[in-house]
């Protein structure tokens, strides 16, 4: 199983599937469709049924039930795209057998080193087979490891018909990294009662709480006049933008928060004297505090408008997704089953909130309750990304164990 997982991850990683938030198509990039079509062929090859791909690149497939029992249909999902934070072009994965616990030179010429001094958890992987980058791209284990694990678990179940299970649905989706993963996902066609995204990080992660999330674009407009004759006339949009940001609570930013703490995150600032725009994301686990944060943004804008004029500041704010806990709590047994599956395999479940979102955040509000389980990866979205192949085996085994437990409980 381990070699199969490594082969799959490497072959998927080599397809550039970075999504693009400025594109209006679905999927947002052609590489995602290329990988989706590869996955369709592979699903057919391993013996999955009802394999489909729609015009938006959503792949679905079925493993039919092999039990007499009435078992609820469950699904497993992963996304094909990689993050916009770092290049996913020409990914060249490195396989390190029997990792010795020391520095890993990812790229000698560029002096890129993956070191336990910088990443202390790396030392815990001594003895593991690791898959790393070559120091010039991300790896794409987020979420191609999830795809590999789902595919390998399905192949295992097909090869072992003595393992009884209900109907299983599988889906591979585009554009998760730009928040659009579920936008064109056909929940009705998928037709599962519950599902799991296989999109978590280190071994044992089990998540059913996500942020409430909004995006805000603040546009500040000024009046540009020759600086030599600007007294009493110039209004500097860049300075209005600086005042806006300075009015937000300084310590409520990603670099100062953890656990259940929310934040305002300035993604980008662009502009000049005439016009400057600020792009933020707003995050909180608690719905009331989330709404308070959005109110704070609006109040600061209103104060600046009072000072500089009605058209000086505009706020364009929209909600992106909500904390899936609200939709999963009523069917908490799906979390309990995943918890028990890990325990059965001597994996210590690490139940913690996702300081982010998954496709499951939105799908849970679309009628498909969808917690998240680990892939085994670390340091997603950058050149220091790596994954333990040994823990990928454990993730695939957890999928198999979840399926068994649903059948046993029926």
Curated annotation (Swiss-Prot):
The active site is at 81, 176 (proton acceptor). Its main location: cytoplasm. It catalyses: Release of the N-terminal residue from a tripeptide. Its cofactor is Zn(2+). One of its GO terms (cellular component) is cytosol. Zn(2+) 2 binds at residues 142, 177, 381. It comes from the Bacteria. Its EC number is 3.4.11.4. One of its GO terms (biological process) is peptide catabolic process. It is an enzyme of class 3 (hydrolase). It is found in: Cytoplasm. Zn(2+) 1 binds at residues 79, 142, 199. The keyword Iron does not apply. Gene3D superfamilies: 3.30.70.360, Zn peptidases. Keywords: Aminopeptidase, Cytoplasm, Hydrolase, Metal-binding, Metalloprotease, Protease, Zinc. Binds 2 Zn(2+) ions per subunit. GO terms for molecular function: metallopeptidase activity; tripeptide aminopeptidase activity; zinc ion binding. Pfam families: M20_dimer (PF07687), Peptidase_M20 (PF01546). Cleaves the N-terminal amino acid of tripeptides. Belongs to the peptidase M20B family. This is Peptidase T. The lineage of its organism: Bacteria, Bacillati, Bacillota, Bacilli, Bacillales.
């Amino acid at each position: 199983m381990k070699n199969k997982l490594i082969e799959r991850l490497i072959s998927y990683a080599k397809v550039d599937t970075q999504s693009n938030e400025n594109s209006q198509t679905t999927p947002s990039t052609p590489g995602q469709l290329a990988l989706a079509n590869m996955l369709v062929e592979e699903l057919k090859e391993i013996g999955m049924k009802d394999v489909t791909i729609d015009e938006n690149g959503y792949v679905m497939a079925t493993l039919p039930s092999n039990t007499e029992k009435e078992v609820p249909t469950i699904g497993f999902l992963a996304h094909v795209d990689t993050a916009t934070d770092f290049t996913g072009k020409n990914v060249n994965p490195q396989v390190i057998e029997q990792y010795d616990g020391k520095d890993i030179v990812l790229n000698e010429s560029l002096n890129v080193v993956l070191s336990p001094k910088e990443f202390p958890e790396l030392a815990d992987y001594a003895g593991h087979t690791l898959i790393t980058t070559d120091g010039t791209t991300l790896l794409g284990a987020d979420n191609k490891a999830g795809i590999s694990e789902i595919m390998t678990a399905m192949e295992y179940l097909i090869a072992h018909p003595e393992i009884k299970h209900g109907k299983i649905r599988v889906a591979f989706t585009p554009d998760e990294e730009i928040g659009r993963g579920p936008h064109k996902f056909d929940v009705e066609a998928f037709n599962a009662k519950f599902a799991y995204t296989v999109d978590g990080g280190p071994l044992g992660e089990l998540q059913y709480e996500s942020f409430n999330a909004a995006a805000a674009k603040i546009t500040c407009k000024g009046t540009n006049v020759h600086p030599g004759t600007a007294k009493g006339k110039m209004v500097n949009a860049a300075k209005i933008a600086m005042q806006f940001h300075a009015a937000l609570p300084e310590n409520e930013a990603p670099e100062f928060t953890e656990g259940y703490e929310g934040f305002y995150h300035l993604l980008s600032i662009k502009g000049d004297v005439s016009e400057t725009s600020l792009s933020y994301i707003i995050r909180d686990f608690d719905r009331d505090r989330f709404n308070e944060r959005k109110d704070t943004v609006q109040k600061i804008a209103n104060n600046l408008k009072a000072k500089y004029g009605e058209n000086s500041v505009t706020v364009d704010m929209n909600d992106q997704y909500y904390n899936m806990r609200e939709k999963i709590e009523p069917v908490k047994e799906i979390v309990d089953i995943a918890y028990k599956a890990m325990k059965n395999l001597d994996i210590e479940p690490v139940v913690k909130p996702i300081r982010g979102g998954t496709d499951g955040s939105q799908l849970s509000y679309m009628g498909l309750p969808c917690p998240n389980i680990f892939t085994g990866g670390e340091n997603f979205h950058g050149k220091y990304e790596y994954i333990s192949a040994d823990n990928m085996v454990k993730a695939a085994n957890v999928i198999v164990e979840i399926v068994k437990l649903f059948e046993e409980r029926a």
